[in-house]
Amino acid sequence: MPSQVFNRHYWSARELVVLGVFSAAAKLSTLLVALVGGGMNPVSLLAKNLIFTTLLVVMLYKVRKPGTLALFVLVNMLISMLLLGGSVTLLPAMLLAAGCAEAAMVCAGGMRKPWAPVLGVAVYDLTSKIFSLGVSWLFMRESPALLYVIVPIVVIGYVGSLCGLFSGVRADEIQSLLVVMDAQFIPQIR
């Protein structure tokens, strides 16, 4: 019986590069939208969440392994903490949201299902927004009126995330179509 060779590494180098590039692109593009958009206005909130969610959906279509979303969240929060001074208190909430999304994808049939990345990102976006509101409530429970100001901002951001789900699927379909067209065109040149 031939011995089977087991891969010691869960993610390949290509998958880790894809994850890192998409994480950096998501953080950089949302930062640029915030700077160009002039801060926290509804248009820039929608655009930031739309771009972030689109990139996350496309990345999950590229790297279809359990745990990818959690690793993306870790890398993204690390970039946020180092570059932007992001709050460390959001890391447990984001990891819990990533765990809920990973569990939803597994319960729905696994990462190989065609709609699994969209489901995972939808659950992640919803639970991360809810958990971040929970963290905000924890810090502002002496003055709950401040939380009333935050809720509409989070809701506007989630609308952008919902739009990003559809644009992420569309971007992946367009990219897949370009790969097929490229594969058909290259043999004709040679």
Regions from the PLM with identified roles:
Residues 2-67:
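Hydrophobic transmembrane alpha-helices
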Residues 16-21, 46-50, 66-74, 91-92, ...:
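Hydrophobic alpha-helical transmembrane segments
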Residues 23-31, 74-83, 121-132:
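Aromatic-anchored segments of alpha-helical transmembrane domains
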Residues 24, 30, 45, 85, ...:
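N-terminal, helix-rich and Lys/Arg-enriched segments in bacterial and organellar proteins
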Residues 28, 93-133:
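Short helix-perturbing small/polar motifs within transmembrane alpha-helices
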Residues 33-37, 41, 63, 67, ...:
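Membrane-interfacial segments
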Residues 44-103:
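Alpha-helical membrane segments and adjacent membrane-interface helices in multi-pass membrane proteins
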Residues 114-190:
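Membrane-embedded alpha-helical hairpins and interfacial helices in multi-pass inner-membrane proteins
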